Amino acid sequence: MQEQYRPEEIESKVQLHWDENRTFEVTEDESKEKYYCLSMLPYPSGRLHMGHVRNYTIGDVIARYQRMLGKNVLQPIGWDAFGLPAEGAAVKNNTAPAPWTYDNIAYMKNQLKMLGFGYDWSRELATCTPEYYRWEQKFFTELYKKGLVYKKTSAVNWCPNDQTVLANEQVIDGCCWRCDTKVERKEIPQWFIKITAYADELLNDLDKLDHWPDTVKTMQRNWIGRSEGVEISFDVNDYADKLTVYTTRPDTFMGCTYLAVAAGHPLAQQAAANNPALATFIDECRNTKVAEADMATMEKKGVDTGFKAIHPLTGEEIPVWAANFVLMEYGTGAVMAVPGHDQRDYEFASKYGLNIKPVILAADGSEPDLSEQALTEKGVLFNSGEFSGLDYEAGFNAIADKLAAMGVGERKVNYRLRDWGVSRQRYWGAPIPMVTLEDGTVLPTPEDQLPVILPEDVVMDGITSPIKADPEWAKTTVNGQPALRETDTFDTFMESSWYYARYTCPQYQEGMLDSKAANYWLPVDIYIGGIEHAIMHLLYFRFFHKLMRDAGMVNSDEPAKQLLCQGMVLADAFYYVGENGERNWVSPVDAIVERDEKGRIVKAKDAAGHELVYTGMSKMSKSKNNGIDPQVMVERYGADTVRLFMMFASPADMTLEWQESGVEGANRFLKRVWKLVYEHTTKGEVAALNVAALSEDQKALRRDIHKTIAKVTDDIGRRQTFNTAIAAIMELMNKLAKAPQEDEQDRALMQEALLAVVRMLNPFTPHASFTLWRELNGEGDIDNAPWPVADESAMVEDSTLVVVQVNGKVRGKITVAVDATEEQVRERAGQEHLVAKYLDGKTVRKVIYVPGKLLNLVVG
């Protein structure tokens, strides 16, 4: 065994061993308990970042631990390979998205191997290959035949100069990111999947997810947004159709003083024909990109349409306004306004001088003061005719019943959730498998024409999708008739919604899933990824699982039993102010810092001498140039050190502050472990451990060893507090470093301890553990070794410390057998010289004994 710990030598050797022996490849085995450990698959951006390293290290620690428990562990990896960044990079580098993507995959695969992750590489998949997306296309056509897919027009961001659709992130301050042209809103036909058909189940089944973070479940509940209310129809003077609104507060209906419709509503369009101000307003709204998140903060604007609606209960005429806070995509595109009891309605009414009518009493029973804001709390109705005096629930029901009896109201359950728009007007995605015949008939692509392959050898101009620019690509024949293929591609959330299931049977050619394999491995036992995916990916992931279940492919209701959301990785951020006042961000690697006695940064400069402003710790990002390259760290310290620091520096679900001093500390610890094993093994053969012959000190050390095993097992397996597990191993190592090595039993005990330590470290530092296990002559390879089991008998305390008091004052502490009698404890106390001098010549008048803890002798 070499004396020095040299990770650069051992890590590549161990990785080669894993590759050659296919150590982590698994197949279904009904005789073993399965464990499916999955980290969210990466986008092949070109290089791994520390967020990846943290996510995948957590997964690998769990997978290796479960493997050591004797389970059949599946830990696969793949590539979420479609998406917009590849198009931008292709234009920038004068290439096509495919070669750029495949080059990145090859590079990042080597980086993952360099970090020692125990993946089953035989199951690797890339979502941009026809072998993968063909099954997604086939499934989409089946959903279409079931009535779960439809096409309708929907608003997109349109650049009139480039004649192309822009993603939201390509719209900068209302203008095109490429040519700075003002972006317009344009209605185009798009494909949707009816996720709303599963809204109730997606909501209710959250209650089955006991091991998902409450924050994620709350976010999904709010996103689905189930509400109970009443849909109400209004007659409108001089307008052919009724206006329908939905409200969750029918108790306030007598305070409805106006209606508001979206700018795109047919009523507003009709009114605009004779109203230039309204026509201008509609144009403004059409060209304003409004995310739902912005609605609460933006200025509320509107124009009176001139139409008057009839309040169904009072018969009063109320104005109908077009307003920018109503969206056609939500509900009916019309809302009823109760400015006395809704703050948004109040602000709008105040701005435009509309009637504000209070109909709910304040909590103290007085009329509400509406001089500055609306009263939004529920309460007793007043100013509401026959409904006055009713509380919220009674008022809700009475008004709902009355409207229903009149035929103008209907109780409804509504959802905030909207159907999933899966059309993207981009090139680098899976083609949507639909065709249009010459007579306008839309059909799914026949199965014998699947997959619809995306051509990879293309020229990118940065404006138009190559498959939209090439009229020949779209031409096809269906049932002997000429047809045109759909040139939109799938939203890339499609691919990431079912990849976890395809990992169970990546080579299967008979269909999307091999149900036997899928049902052996699924559901995923633990899924690891960032909380930023809470409502998009994780909702589609759950939805797709239910679709596959209803297609008979899987027999479980949910895709993953446990969800672990890892925290962000933070690093120091520095900048200096340039000549033009701009901020130039400097990498923390290049910052020369001075610290105070508490280790806080007080001064910093870079190599060029710029005085740096320190902005504190913030999320590693390109914009602040504070990312740390994992590859540089691995080359400097070794993969095991980086992994150990990642798991020790913070609980897995909390933010992690990157400190190179902490990495150095992890490296020093591994060197200490290596040194102790080296010193132990160079002393030659080790005798068998004779537990019965151990001295008190040896028993105490063995007790510490097995208590550590018990704690680390609980910390990793149940609590998933990996940092405290490592801390416990470090504490034990400190004791082992001081332990005597004088006789055979000392060395036998050290052998037992080191075999346990190396196995407990294996999930965290697999290369060093693999090597040290062999040096310690462990049985077989550590990858197949069982997790150490705590010996209960070793942890039993056979002695205990008793505090001895004389007249209530502590005079000594004695060690006695756990089962010692009171007489034996008194006798032992009398032999303790510190106690004996206080008893000399005195009579013991009373004895107070708390077994195993305290002996108080009252003397006089």
Curated annotation (Swiss-Prot):
An example of a GO molecular function for this protein is: ATP binding
Q: Note the InterPro entries from the entry.
A: aa-tRNA-synth_I_CS, aa-tRNA-synth_Ia, Leu-tRNA-ligase, Leu_tRNA-synth_edit, M/V/L/I-tRNA-synth_anticd-bd, Methionyl/Leucyl_tRNA_Synth, Rossmann-like_a/b/a_fold, tRNAsynth_Ia_anticodon-bd
Q: Does the keyword Nucleotide-binding apply?
A: yes
**If you read the UniProt record, what top EC class would you report for this enzyme, in one word?**
ligase
Q: Which UniProt keywords apply?
A: Aminoacyl-tRNA synthetase, ATP-binding, Cytoplasm, Ligase, Nucleotide-binding, Protein biosynthesis
Specify the superkingdom.
Bacteria
Annotated compartments: Cytoplasm
| Chain positions recorded as ATP binding sites | 622
Classification via Pfam families: Anticodon_1, tRNA-synt_1, tRNA-synt_1_2, tRNA-synt_1g
Enumerate the Gene Ontology biological process terms: leucyl-tRNA aminoacylation
| Motif residue range(s): 'HIGH' region | 42-52
Q: Which family does it belong to?
A: Belongs to the class-I aminoacyl-tRNA synthetase family.
Q: Under which name does UniProt file this protein?
A: Leucine--tRNA ligase
